[in-house]
Amino acid sequence: MQTIKPVSGNGRGIYEPKKSGLNFPLQLPTLLILSALGFVGAIAISWLLGNSHVTELFVRLHLVQSNPPQWLMPPQLSNNYYLLIPTLILFLVAQVVMKLFPEPTVLSQRLVGGLCLVLFVRYFAWRSFCSLNVANPVDGIFSITLLGMELLAMIGTAFQLLLLFTAKSRTAQADRCSIAVKEGRYNPTVDILIPTYNEPDFIVKRTIMGCQALNYERKQIYVLDDTRRQSMKQLAQELGCHYLTRPDNSHAKAGNLNSALKQTHGELVVVFDADFVPTTNFLERTVGFFHNSKIGLLQTPQSYYNSDPIARNLGLENVLTPEEEVFYRYLQPIRDGAGSVVCAGTSFIARRSALQEIDYFVTDSVSEDYFTGIRLSAKGYELAYLNEKLSAGLAAESIGAHIDQRLRWGRGTLQAFFIKSNPLTIPGLNPWQRLAHLEGLAHWLTCFPRVFFLFVPIISTFAQLNPINTSLPETLYVTLPYYVLLLSVFSWLNRRSRSILLSDIYSIVQAIPVLFTVVKVLLNPFGKGFIVTPKGMARDKFNYNWSLAMPMTILLGATLISFCISLFKFPEAGMSLGLVWGAYNLVTIAVAMMTLLDLPKLSLYEWYNRKQEVNLYGDRHVYPGKTQKISEEGVEIVLDPAVHLPTNVMVELIPEILVVSGRVTRSCTVDGALNAIVKFQNVTTEQHRELVELLYCRPGQWETRKIPNELQSGLILFKLLLRPLVFLNSKKVKQMKLHY
């Protein structure tokens, strides 16, 4: 079993695995995968070299393509455009269902999901039996590879549509269970664990204060400091919570949690990452579930109180949802129905006795949370998911940190193939649970088709290959209905958390780094240790991530050249594919490259749009106004009509009646009103608590934003291409500087 130790020096937040001493680094799953790839490669080479047996096999496949099953082919009609009727009917049915059920119900979800699943099977049957171009080895290899990549890209979606039939909501159950907790009839002891490794003190302080504000008496709060900082120990003492540490950092976060579990005694255990702040009703809404002895763990969503770097860099903070939203709003409920909820490592509550049965948290992977949940399921415990935003944390603050975080998640998940907690083989799981976990594992393999699709128009144009044999009637009758329905209902099915077009931007940004990580994991699954995502950082300059941009720049140039060639040779075979696909790739790659420009982040604190009444006191005068933004650092205020403010003032927030001293750092007159920035000064611990509770702990404050539909998403992409993003960002930075 690997052990993990902290790296000394400049590697902030890095745990490095010790060498295991194995003589054979390639493990059995890796050898099986390489053998399968070698077998497929040998067939392809044999076909290219003209091997008679292999050639005969593909001649027969070509005969199947030339004489496809009639049920897959379009009917013969006097006008091909009559073949649009099925697409129009499906589109209208989808619109009617979405109009009748703006929020998907179990029945409507199953109806639409079942229809999509049928069209999925029909489409891939047609692709397999009717559209392959295997007339010669070169076209054939390209055509079959494209089909395989399409299937790999969409198989996860097919699994999701199948699992939709088991989707579950526990809100009503939470309403019932919370009654006993609020009335004091069920109040088990709760230990709240906050593991920390190098996070700034002000972030951990915010989390501690949020945990102390929870509406629950029988709780103990523990800071688990894996860097043994004197300042963190003093912070815990100052705020009145427990401080735990250990002599080494073996097994990273999992080891930290396991060490704490052996020193604490609460019946239930809550884990919050150092940057996650709960709302005051977190325990009221979750503890009651454990009255049922079968419940081993309850997960709640990971929400974020700042925008992810992709949305921020594109200037779409108020439009895009965090990438994780589709997982917590759509995938976790269907996983809950299948009994395969994913433990996300934070914002969850578990039964101590259940953790003891599995020897606490799993230590042989960097995704200790995921595999701990699998072991609990295998032991017969039920993992539940409550789809309510009861906490919020800090999203990665730069595009580089965002990608590194995804690479860690992917690396940890794919380590499933190499450890005993493999959800596909571990005893105790049923077929539905294994299917749901297979969907999660397959997700990380979609980087291969995503990257391959970027090369398709380039290969098609330069090599003059035609990977898809199709006609206009087939396109209208088979391809169009499937994609039109999927585009129409995708965001509705996932509860408006993600659109296909905008989601593809996220996929392109991370596809190439994830692909290299997947290959590394398959060759050396434990070659890299746990890397903590840096949090609480500020920067005063633009930063373009050239390491991520370089491969995309090359792809953009090659795609542009292939597009121009296709434009002049449009009538030729294969060129129409290069033209249409190339145009799409040009748009998405260009927008993806825009996301790599990190904006300056001048404050360590988040400023929230919040309008409420405020009074300023100074020079024996009262100045009434309204807040525009509030943070732990200060407040932006509008006073209408404009007045002359003294430099030092007292700020009274209404209706909280929170009074804090402050200093006016910026002010300007706009349309007869005074806009002023007031920085708080000499904030006491109690005042800071009130600010944290106001900004982070109010139940229901973390909104569920709805993503634009596909048509709106397409318009957003084109607007991004047309507007001068760098100048927009410069303007935003100037506005930001007014606050600091």
Model regions: which residues?
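N-terminal membrane-anchoring/stem segments of glycan-assembly enzymes
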Residues: 2-184, 236, 447-450, 571-598, ...
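Membrane-embedded multi-pass helical conduit in multi-pass membrane proteins
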Residues: 50-57, 95-149, 443-528, 543-604, ...
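A conserved acidic beta->alpha catalytic loop
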Residues: 225-232, 248-249
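The conserved acidic donor/metal-binding loop of glycosyltransferases
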Residues: 273-277
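Structured alpha-helical
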Residues: 539-740
